[in-house]
Amino acid sequence: MGTVSSRRSWWPLPLLLLLLLGPAGARAQEDEDGDYEELVLALRSEEDGLAEAPEHGTTATFHRCAKDPWRLPGTYVVVLKEETHLSQSERTARRLQAQAARRGYLTKILHVFHGLLPGFLVKMSGDLLELALKLPHVDYIEEDSSVFAQSIPWNLERITPPRYRADEYQPPDGGSLVEVYLLDTSIQSDHREIEGRVMVTDFENVPEEDGTRFHRQASKCDSHGTHLAGVVSGRDAGVAKGASMRSLRVLNCQGKGTVSGTLIGLEFIRKSQLVQPVGPLVVLLPLAGGYSRVLNAACQRLARAGVVLVTAAGNFRDDACLYSPASAPEVITVGATNAQDQPVTLGTLGTNFGRCVDLFAPGEDIIGASSDCSTCFVSQSGTSQAAAHVAGIAAMMLSAEPELTLAELRQRLIHFSAKDVINEAWFPEDQRVLTPNLVAALPPSTHGAGWQLFCRTVWSAHSGPTRMATAVARCAPDEELLSCSSFSRSGKRRGEHMEAQGGKLVCRAHNAFGGEGVYAIARCCLLPQANCSVHTAPPAEAGMGTRVHCHQQGHVLTGCSSHWEVEDLGTHKPPVLRPRGQPNQCVGHREASIHASCCHAPGLECKVKEHGIPAPQEQVTVACEEGWTLTGCSALPGTSHVLGAYGIDNTCVVRSRDVSTTGRTSEEALAAVAICCRSRHLVQASQELQ
């Protein structure tokens, strides 16, 4: 896909002024953009009033889309440092214009951001990037790029719990207290499915269509937006039939928009929220572009303001982490499945996958409102449709419990999903362990879920292959990191540990010499009023295993991890299991440092479960019983034969290398260690409600 066709050529300023002096040139410029001549004169008049920015070097960086066909060179988002005020943003923009004019270049400020993030959108020559990066307050600059719509009645039955399944879809809550913002094409608001439920705002920021010099009217191309509005809240085919919606037009008739247009749309939502605070807000982003630091940052700001953002994973049959806003950690990212709960295939492409996907939802042959007429319906497919389902489910959950935080909502979506129903063989082999096997579903009840201890598994990005490379996994701000583990496909790793970073604990994993890289795996939980700490025991004396326990009164063990400096711990037979009667203890190899995660919270109780098997098995699992939640997952022994340990739902999985490549003997054993916790106070509260 090419760049937007309206991009202008850039002329040196003296030549441009000569052209403006001539009658023909003046008329042409006036037709093209009437305010350019006034801008040139204004810049010349204030040129002497603005001093040059100091050029003592800069820490500002430049970013652009990795997908070359999606780039829009000539338009740039200049992001300023977080504490920059609006007046400083405006002065920085004027300074850029004045200094560019001194060098013979014309620039145009298209938008000044404030309220969501500080910065401005500028149209200028790429020759000015070095100058712009040295301006005061600049944090980074990102070249604009394109984003695209992600669309190419079984679906309502699929997301409904069995106890509610009947001849009609009748969810326990319609989402009437929630407002959903849709950033898409426009919407045919008089369609009988959504009439009276959707307000079409006056917001519009779309690029010209490829091969044209004009915008078609929104009413001529509102199929995608109309369909998604119907999926979210349609009278007959909608998920949250009581939710109200507002639409912002950020995609043109070809389903194409820009990162900058999406940013301005998100800023519009934030300003609306500040001017007229309402109840819970859900923002549906059924679009995808290349990875964008600035778009992810804007999503983060809006999420931290209390807005729930749901986005399409993308339809490129690729790692969702390569796309935005799908890669933003604060966004709920949704992949697409079909009626058989299998990943959606769209020609040679299909749903995206990987660690940045939170869950999947129905996204193939979804019946919804059509813009062809006010009573027409049409079938569409894609991760846009899947995201619309989750936006509807989120609206119903928030309507039932308006005080839910983003972290609480995400944990509930994961907890109540259908598990282990997707055929993982569809995904690339290296993505199978990273991709969640979850299909969205409504909870059996939208009330009473608060008594459960919710946890999820968060994978880091893959580290580099160098010996000292590390990977870091982080929990959301409202979550507690209760345990840390690591995984390497080659088995060449040096373990993991928890450390404080920016006032929060993070999980750091270490690659080993000759390794191909490592993943850090965090177990992130909702644990109100928790007080957690990490206790470490250094490598033990020869002939002894290393042990560490929770020594603070009232603290219980929630996770164990180990880290070693040697390249190969060798074998350890049999695995060192903890002595009976000492549950609050982590044990490990004598040459490793052992770390115990210890937490105190009202009514928190935990227990350890172990399951060991002899070689040659390459995987061992152990699960927590119903009513208990997996908080920790680790392996014994922690040797280089073990690929790593990770949690899937409530099960601890430990994998080892192929026996034929390790030289292991049948005398050696492999054990999975699960730590299972629950809150007695929450359980008692639930029993009282019943």
UniProtKB/Swiss-Prot annotation:
Protein encoded by which gene: PCSK9
Q: What is the lineage of its organism?
A: Eukaryota, Metazoa, Chordata, Craniata, Vertebrata
Kindly state the subunit structure of this protein: Monomer. Can self-associate to form dimers and higher multimers which may have increased LDLR degrading activity. The precursor protein but not the mature protein may form multimers. Interacts with APOB, VLDLR, LRP8/APOER2 and BACE1. The full-length immature form (pro-PCSK9) interacts with SCNN1A, SCNN1B and SCNN1G. The pro-PCSK9 form (via C-terminal domain) interacts with LDLR. Interacts (via the C-terminal domain) with ANXA2 (via repeat Annexin 1); the interaction inhibits the degradation of LDLR.
Question: Which Enzyme Commission number(s) are listed?
Answer: 3.4.21.-
The function of this protein is: Crucial player in the regulation of plasma cholesterol homeostasis. Binds to low-density lipid receptor family members: low density lipoprotein receptor (LDLR), very low density lipoprotein receptor (VLDLR), apolipoprotein E receptor (LRP1/APOER) and apolipoprotein receptor 2 (LRP8/APOER2), and promotes their degradation in intracellular acidic compartments. Acts via a non-proteolytic mechanism to enhance the degradation of the hepatic LDLR through a clathrin LDLRAP1/ARH-mediated pathway.
Question: Which organism encodes this protein?
Answer: Gorilla gorilla gorilla (Western lowland gorilla)
Specify the propeptide location in this chain.
Answer: 29-150
Q: One GO biological process from the UniProt record?
A: proteolysis
- What does the activity regulation annotation say? Its proteolytic activity is autoinhibited by the non-covalent binding of the propeptide to the catalytic domain. Inhibited by EGTA.
**Where Phosphoserine occurs along the chain?**
S45, S686
Q: Which GO terms describe its molecular function?
A: apolipoprotein binding; low-density lipoprotein particle binding; serine-type endopeptidase activity; very-low-density lipoprotein particle binding
Location of site Cleavage? Q150, S151, R216, Q217
Name assigned to this protein: Proprotein convertase subtilisin/kexin type 9
PTMs per UniProt: Cleavage by furin and PCSK5 generates a truncated inactive protein that is unable to induce LDLR degradation.
Could you list this entry's UniProt keywords, alphabetically sorted: Apoptosis, Autocatalytic cleavage, Calcium, Cholesterol metabolism, Cytoplasm, Disulfide bond, Endoplasmic reticulum, Endosome, Glycoprotein, Golgi apparatus, Hydrolase, Lipid metabolism, Lysosome, Phosphoprotein, Protease, Secreted, Serine protease, Signal, Steroid metabolism, Sterol metabolism, Sulfation, Zymogen
Q: Which residues are glycosylated?
A: N531
